[in-house]
Amino acid sequence: DPLRAKFIAENFLEDAVCFNEVRNMFGYTGTYKGERISVMGTGMGMPSISIYARELIVDYGVKKLIRVGTAGSLNENVHVRELVLAQAAATNSNIIRNDWPQYDFPQIASFNLLDKAYHIAKNFGMTTHVGNVLSSDEKYSNYFEKNIELGKWGVKAVEMEAAALYYLAAQHQVDALAIMTISDSLVNPDEDTTAEERQNTFTDMMKVGLETLIAD
């Protein structure tokens, strides 16, 4: 979300400068506790994040990438506003299978970032879940019941970008992690949040992401 990047820059970074406005995909560089940090929107879905993440890695030499965004719960024990750290990302997309047609290439987080983020979140007292997520090509899937079934297999949530991010990180040997806030629930329909809340109030994941990037 480009407006989420703007929110992070305005509320967490010092001396933030906008370095990109092309396609309204705002990007900012500033400092957080003395460390230079960049934040940028990546659009919606795996094709979009694949473009921006690859350019950040290949053209700008970025070595650590953390996605902060929203996800829908697939598990009755994972509730709105709680955090999910994606240890791994299953996917129904063919993006990866186009490269590896005879393999199920596992999309996993950087353990270094995952371990740091988990302990930082717990030290903050945030309710945090670690496990598998589903990266889907469709927000409004025709396979709703199938996705719900994944929750019974321990999949925490569904989102649209983590698998592609982890795949690019593996390809280019850099570190990546996806930190999501649960914005709604597929198993508890009464749990929901507004668009404004999603843009401006999901600050826990932002704090964890920033602290993880500067942790020793």
Swiss-Prot record:
One of its GO terms (cellular component) is cytosol. GO terms for biological process: purine nucleoside catabolic process. A purine D-ribonucleoside binds at residues 159-161, 183-184. The record marks 198 as: Important for catalytic activity. It is an enzyme of class 2 (transferase). Gene3D superfamilies: Nucleoside phosphorylase domain. This is Purine nucleoside phosphorylase DeoD-type.
